[in-house]
Amino acid sequence: MKKHFFFIFMFLLMTRICAFAYPNMIVEHYTAERGLPNNIVNCTLKGQDGFVWFGTWYGLCSFDGTKFRSYDNHDGFYSADIPPRKIQRIVEDRNGYLWIKTIDRKLYLFDKKHESFHAVYDDVKEYSENIQIIKIQTTDDGDVLLLTKDKSLLRANTDQNGKITMKQLHDSRPNVNVYD
């Protein structure tokens, strides 16, 4: 009986000691009142630059650890026809450019140095009849894979100046042979 009591006592003592070994976690909630452009955050990315990037219902937002910065087009500053809103996914390529997929399946490139958006429509349309982007994913070497609605698969990358290069990995369009 004394053995059982001793083991139970030691077990309870050890669990109590282990509970104190964990550091206190501080959880902060960020809302529109604290700087987010919208309370709906669809995706996040920790960039190579250390910033945390948020894709929100109202557009792109960065956080440097102390303050938020929204990249909207209220002042007409950004070069894209319509800056991305309703962002669904953000990935970063090897050169630090952000590839942004929106809920309406459009694709944008964000240049962090110049704080400019580029609609990637013209770069994709020669490879796919349906330019709606279903999924974006980075590869181990920093390229970006793009899956279109018609199931074409593209591999994209940027150079140091932001010029986009695309290569088609899979063409879903059927081969059409024309005979006289």
Go through the PLM ranges and name each one.
Residues 1-180:
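Carboxylate-rich, polar loop motifs that coordinate divalent cations or form catalytic acidic clusters
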